[in-house]
């Protein structure tokens, strides 16, 4: 068993980095600690120009860089110095004049940045595939018992602190080793993804006509949290987040108070937050079992999120119990007070939490309070995954949005301006309701949500039942459907309860019958040409 506390002194370091963030300060600290520094190319020049004593690798090996820099560190005096086992390989190292290298600070050619540039061609991409860097990283990681490998600038300070304490412990070197293998795995995965999208049948191997989906799919996620259990108590679970942070989301949120997030908390909070992001004006979304059970939008001058919460809650007070509440504005103290005095809530999430709100919610220590930060108006593209037995379904994120200008009026009666506002609102909500999804809305408030039924007309019936149970007036409300109506019965049912306007994708073989049903009832109907199935 390796002693976790034994400290490894550093006498010689090799530094060769593409990302030079913090490297000058790090090298100066090493120099002050008496560490001999070997370096290459641009890194050597940077150190030398700034007064840091370093030996160029070419001078140390006696072998100049060649092939336009393709071969720099691939030499026995480098890799023997890194891979040599102290106490085992000392004699052979001495015989060949190989000095031990105790620390390697390396990061790799910016392959991702290169291929992200417009017009990047395959030869350019290939020249930015690092060979010597990953080789040194893997060598040092393999021999982490005797060598420290540093691939992240964020680790420089910790390494210096350890050296000042007498050296790096095995536990520190093990952690650095793990980061190194994670780093090279992500790098190789990125290259494989890129190369796997190129059409090899084309002589030019142009990068302009690449497939959207690589031959093998490589993506890296980092464990953020181990959970007590999964969706059910007999299942184990953990929460992994993307290695590269994106827009504000459940994965970037900071928990300010409350019990540890559960598997279901994370899934439901994601659904609530992604839904509330759809709205520009102040909005509140309440979610239960990944379905919105209440949503409302209220302009600032009409009450903002405080009023929006009241309206969202009024949609379905029973389902809101133990739900998740998301806002697209800073949570203020007054709104927080209304929540904790009115209902039991699992999670509250907002881009920002005011100090007053924190103090109010602090009285309910079990409530999980999350601050996720602001998000851009334009949603970022990305991938969605669905695991099936033995496989993985991968698709682009559903970031499709519509505005009033995109609507196609298909009935004799055109919707009024207020109906259009409500139709667009209901459509945004329907996108986040499990299919078959039906949403009734009025004055930018949901008044009934029918979710997850095998029959679309049954979802419509449930939405009407929900509205009646909540004491909300359906007469004059609008209806949104996430997919087309295969038969006229959905419209006939809507007419019976007083729906005045309908929004749906269109595209059914029986669109003409459905439109006729709407005309017979005096219902205005618009097509979006876009479906929002959610399974």
Curated annotation (Swiss-Prot):
<dbReference type="Pfam" id="PF02142">
    <property type="entry name" value="MGS"/>
</dbReference>
<protein>
    <recommendedName>
        <fullName>Bifunctional purine biosynthesis protein PurH</fullName>
        <ecNumber>2.1.2.3</ecNumber>
        <ecNumber>3.5.4.10</ecNumber>
    </recommendedName>
</protein>
<keyword id="KW-0658">Purine biosynthesis</keyword>
<dbReference type="GO" id="GO:0003937">
    <property type="term" value="F:IMP cyclohydrolase activity"/>
</dbReference>
<dbReference type="InterPro" id="IPR036914">
    <property type="entry name" value="MGS-like_dom_sf"/>
</dbReference>
<keyword id="KW-0511">Multifunctional enzyme</keyword>
<keyword id="KW-0378">Hydrolase</keyword>
<dbReference type="GO" id="GO:0005829">
    <property type="term" value="C:cytosol"/>
</dbReference>
<comment type="pathway">
    <text>Purine metabolism; IMP biosynthesis via de novo pathway; 5-formamido-1-(5-phospho-D-ribosyl)imidazole-4-carboxamide from 5-amino-1-(5-phospho-D-ribosyl)imidazole-4-carboxamide (10-formyl THF route): step 1/1.</text>
</comment>
<dbReference type="InterPro" id="IPR011607">
    <property type="entry name" value="MGS-like_dom"/>
</dbReference>
<comment type="similarity">
    <text>Belongs to the PurH family.</text>
</comment>
<dbReference type="InterPro" id="IPR016193">
    <property type="entry name" value="Cytidine_deaminase-like"/>
</dbReference>
<keyword id="KW-0808">Transferase</keyword>
<comment type="pathway">
    <text>Purine metabolism; IMP biosynthesis via de novo pathway; IMP from 5-formamido-1-(5-phospho-D-ribosyl)imidazole-4-carboxamide: step 1/1.</text>
</comment>
<dbReference type="Pfam" id="PF01808">
    <property type="entry name" value="AICARFT_IMPCHas"/>
</dbReference>
<dbReference type="GO" id="GO:0006189">
    <property type="term" value="P:'de novo' IMP biosynthetic process"/>
</dbReference>
<dbReference type="InterPro" id="IPR024051">
    <property type="entry name" value="AICAR_Tfase_dup_dom_sf"/>
</dbReference>
<feature type="domain" description="MGS-like">
    <location>
        <begin position="6"/>
        <end position="151"/>
    </location>
</feature>
<dbReference type="GO" id="GO:0004643">
    <property type="term" value="F:phosphoribosylaminoimidazolecarboxamide formyltransferase activity"/>
</dbReference>
<dbReference type="InterPro" id="IPR002695">
    <property type="entry name" value="PurH-like"/>
</dbReference>
């Amino acid at each position: 068993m390796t002693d976790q506390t034994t400290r490894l002194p550093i006498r010689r370091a090799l530094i060769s980095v593409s990302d030079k963030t913090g490297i000058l300060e790090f090298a100066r600290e090493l120099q002050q600690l008496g560490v001999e520094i070997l370096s290459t190319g641009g890194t050597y020049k940077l150190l030398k120009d700034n007064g840091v004593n370093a030996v160029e690798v070419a001078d140390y090996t006696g072998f100049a860089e060649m092939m336009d820099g393709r071969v720099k560190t691939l030499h026995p005096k480098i890799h023997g110095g890194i891979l040599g086992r102290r106490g085992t390989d000392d004699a052979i190292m001495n015989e060949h004049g190989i000095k031990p290298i105790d620390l390697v600070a390396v990061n790799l050619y910016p392959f991702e940045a290169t291929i992200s540039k417009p017009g990047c061609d395959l030869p350019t991409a290939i020249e930015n595939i690092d060979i010597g860097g990953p080789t040194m990283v893997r060598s040092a990681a393999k021999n982490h018992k005797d060598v420290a490998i540093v691939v992240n600038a964020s680790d420089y300070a910790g390494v210096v602190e350890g050296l000042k304490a007498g050296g790096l412990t095995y536990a520190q070197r093990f952690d650095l080793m793990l980061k190194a293998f994670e780093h090279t795995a992500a790098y190789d995965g990125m290259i494989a993804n890129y190369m796997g999208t190129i059409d090899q049948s084309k002589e030019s191997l142009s990068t302009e006509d690449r497939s959207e989906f690589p031959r093998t799919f490589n993506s890296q996620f980092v464990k953020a949290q181990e959970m007590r259990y999964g969706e059910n108590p007999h299942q184990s679970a953990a929460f992994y987040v993307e290695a590269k942070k994106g827009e504000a989301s459940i994965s970037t949120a900071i928990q300010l108070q409350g019990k540890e997030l559960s598997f279901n908390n994370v899934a439901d909070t994601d659904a609530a937050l992604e839904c509330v992001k759809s709205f520009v004006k102040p909005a509140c979304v309440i979610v239960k079992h990944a379905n919105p059970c209440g949503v409302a939008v209220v302009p600032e001058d009409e009450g903002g999120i405080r009023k929006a919460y009241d309206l969202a809650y009024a949609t379905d007070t029973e389902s809101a119990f133990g739900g998740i509440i998301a806002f697209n504005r800073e949570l203020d103290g007054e709104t927080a007070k209304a929540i904790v005095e009115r209902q039991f809530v699992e999670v509250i999430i907002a881009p920002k939490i005011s100090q007053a709100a924190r103090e109010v919610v602090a009285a309910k220590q079990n409530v999980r309070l999350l601050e996720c930060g602001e998000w851009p108006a334009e949603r970022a593209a990305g991938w969605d995954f669905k695991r099936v037995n033995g496989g993985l379904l991968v698709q682009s994120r559903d970031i499709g949005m519509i505005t009033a200008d995109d609507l196609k009026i298909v009935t004799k009666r055109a919707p009024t301006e207020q109906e259009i506002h409500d139709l667009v609102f209901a459509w945004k909500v329907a996108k986040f309701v499990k299919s078959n999804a039906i949403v009734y809305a009025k004055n930018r408030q949901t008044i009934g949500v029918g979710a997850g039924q095998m029959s679309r007309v049954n979802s419509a019936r449930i939405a009407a039942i929900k509205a009646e149970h909540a004491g909300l007036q359906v007469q004059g409300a609008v209806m949104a459907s996430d997919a087309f109506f295969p038969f006229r019965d959905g419209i006939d049912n809507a007419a019976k309860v007083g729906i005045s306007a309908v929004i749906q994708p269109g595209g059914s073989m029986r669109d003409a019958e459905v439109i006729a049903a709407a005309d017979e009832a005096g219902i205005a109907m618009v097509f979006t040409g876009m479906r929002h199935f959610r399974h």
